[in-house]
UniProtKB/Swiss-Prot annotation:
Classification of source organism: Eukaryota, Metazoa, Chordata, Craniata, Vertebrata
Originating species: Bos taurus (Bovine)
Protein's cellular compartments: Nucleus; Chromosome
Protein name: DNA replication licensing factor MCM7
UniProt: ATP 1 binding residues: 345, 384, 386-388, 489
Residues of the MCM domain: 332-538
Binding-site positions, ATP 2: 514, 604
GO biological process, one term: DNA replication
Glycoprotein recorded as keyword: yes
UniProt cross-references to PROSITE patterns, sorted A to Z: MCM_1 (PS00847), MCM_2 (PS50051)
PTM section of the record: O-glycosylated (O-GlcNAcylated), in a cell cycle-dependent manner. Ubiquitinated by ECS(LRR1) E3 ubiquitin-protein ligase complex when forks converge following formation of DNA interstrand cross-links. During mitosis, ubiquitinated by TRAIP when forks converge following formation of DNA interstrand cross-links. Short ubiquitin chains on MCM7 promote recruitment of DNA glycosylase NEIL3. If the interstrand cross-link cannot be cleaved by NEIL3, the ubiquitin chains continue to grow on MCM7, promoting the unloading of the CMG helicase complex by the VCP/p97 ATPase.
Amino acid sequence: MALKDYVLEKDKVKKFLQEFYQDDESGKKQFKYGNQLVQLAHREQVAMYVDLDDIAEDDPELVDSICENTKRYARLFADAVQELLPQYKEREVVNKDVLDVYIEHRLMMEQRSRDPGAARSPQNQYPPELMRRFELYFQGPSSNKPRVIREVRADSVGKLVTVRGIVTRVSEVKPRMVVATYTCDQCGAETYQPIQSPTFMPLIMCPSQECQTNRSGGRLYLQTRGSKFIKFQEMKMQEHSDQVPVGNIPRSITVLVEGENTRIAQPGDHVSVTGIFLPILRTGFRQMVQGLLSETYLEAHRIVKMSKSEEDESGAGELTREELRQITEEDFYEKLAASIAPEIYGHEDVKKALLLLLVGGVDQSPRGMKIRGNINICLMGDPGVAKSQLLSYIDRLAPRSQYTTGRGSSGVGLTAAVLRDSVSGELTLEGGALVLADQGVCCIDEFDKMAEADRTAIHEVMEQQTISIAKAGILTTLNARCSILAAANPAYGRYNPRRSLEQNIQLPAALLSRFDLLWLIQDRPDRDNDLRLAQHITYVHQHSRQPPAQFEPLDMKLMRRYIAMCREKQPAVPESLADYITAAYVEMRREAWASKDATYTSARTLLAILRLSTALARLRMVDTVEKEDVNEAIRLMEMSKDSLLGDKGQTARTQRPADVIFATVRELVSEGQSVRFSEAEQRCISRGFTPAQFQAALDEYEELNVWQVNTARTRITFV
C-alpha cells in the first residue's frame, strides 16, 4: 500500500469545499460548503458538518480514506478550512468574544516588540487549535449501516463507525481545556500547550530563550483567560434489548461528546451515534496493574435521536403483497391476537388486550395537558396459568422492552439512580427500567411481591408518563412513555372465592385505577377444558411447536413490522360517537353503584375505553374510530370486570339472558319511548350476548306484549 501524500490530499479537500454545489428548485447552483465557510468566517455558524455522501459523488477513494483514518483527516479538513476562511471573510466580525480580543491584543503587542522581518520564536508560535474558532464533524455515508455495540471490536480502532443504542447515563456539561496558556514570572513570555487527551501534565519551567540564556529558572503559571476551552460531556450507551443474544449481558460503550453535539441526548433516549472509535490509556494505579490494556471510547461526530416510529429500529419497510394478503384476510383481528404466544392454549380475550397494548392509543395534549395513549394491563391469576409466559413473549415481540421482576427490582432500579462518576467524582443520573423502556413496554413479573414503597414509584409513570427526580441536588424530569404490563398472584398464592375481591387482590385503588384492564385468570376444574389443555401441552412437548390450527400463526417479524405501521396512524374520535361513549360510561357508573361493584369505576375508565377504541382503529389502519371499535373496547372492559367478579358476574347471564337483555334495552330509553333496533342489538352484543340470544329475548318479550318491533325491524317501542 502506497504512502499517502497528505499535501495532495489537502488540495483535494480544498477543491471539494470550494467547488461542490447542488442545484436548488429553481436550477441555481448552491455552493453548500462555500455558504458554510462564509457563515464560519462571520461567526454566524459554529460547527461545520461534512457529509461523506457529497464527497462520494466525486471521489469515493477519499471517502474510504476518511473512514479508515478519520482522526488524521479531521485535522486535515480543519487545516484546509482555516486556510480558506480569509478568502470568504467579507466584513469584520461584529460579535467578538474574550478570546478574540485576547489574540488580537497579543498579536498587536508582539508586532510592536518584534523587529521588522524577524521570524517568531517557535515557543511563542500560536497553535492552530487556539486560532481555530470553529468545529468540524463528519456525517457518515448512507451505506454505513448502524452496527451493534458488541460488533465494534479492535479492528475498528481509528475508523468512523455508527452504532445504535439507548442512553443510560449522561454527565453534566463541563469545560474541557484544549490549549493551556502559561505566563513566565521572570521574563513574561507566554507558552502554549495543546492538550489532546482528557488528562495532561502542566508545564512548570519556562522554555523561552531568555530564561534559558540567563538561567533565571522562570516558573510558568496557568493563565485561564488566555486558554481555550470547549464544551465536554460524557455519555454511556447500551445495546437495545432486541440486539442482546439470549442469556447475554447488554454491552455498553462510553461516548465523549464535545462542542455543539452536547445536550442532545438524555437518559432513556434511543440514539444513533457516528464517531471515531479510539483507545485511551488507563491512568494512575490502574495503569500500573493493567499497563497493556486500554479503555475504548467513541468520539462523537454526529448524534441523531431516533424518531417515535419503530420503523428505524425494526427495519420495517413496505410490506409485500403476500404479507398484506396474510394480514388483510377475514378475522385478521382474531388472527393477530391468536398469533401472540400460539404455544399457549386459550386466553383469547387476554391476547386481544395484549395486542392492543402493543399498538397503543393516541396521545392527547389539549392546551399543554398531556393525556397518555399507552395502555396499562395487569394480569392476575392462580399459579400455572401462563402469565409469565405471556409477559416473556410480549417482551420478545415489542421492539423496545424491558423485563424485570418485582422481587428483584427496587424503586431506584425502576425509575432512576444517582451515581458518582468514577473519573470526575461528580453525581450523575442513570435511568432505570422504566426510563430505558421509553416508547416501549415494561414487563414487571411478580408485581405483588414488590415492596409497597417501591411500588408507589411507578404511580407517576403510569399516568403522567414521566419520572420526576429530586436527589442529591439533581432536579429533573425524565421521559418514561411506556406501557406497563404487570403479572401478579392473588394474596396467599391462589384466588380464594370465599374472600372478597379486595382481600384477594390487596392492591390500592390508586394503583388499580391506573390499569386500563385488570384481568383475573382463574384455574377452575372443568373436564372438557382440562382435556383440551392437556392434549395441547402434550403435543407441544412432543413436537416442540404449537398444534396445527385453522390458520398459520403470523411470523414475529411480520407482526412487529405491522404493529410499527399501525403506530404511525393517529385516529380521532368523531363527534357522532361522543354521545354514545358518554351514555355507555354513565351506564357503567350506574351499574357499578347499583350492584356495589368491587371494581373501581372512575373517569380513568372512560379514558381507557377511548384508548382501546383508538388502538382498535389503528389496528385497522384507519383515521377514524367507528362504533364497532367502541363496542369491542366496552366488551373487553366488561369481560375483564366479569373475570374479577367470577361466578357472581356470570350468574345473571347463565340463568336468564333474556332478563338481562331486557334491562339493557330498557336502560337505553326513557319511559314510554322507543329505541333503534341496531343500537339495542349492538349494546347487547357489547355486553357479551350473541345475536341469537338477543333475537330470542326480543321474541319472548314481544309475545308478552312488553314491546313491539315495527315491520322494517328498525325500532323497538315499549307498550
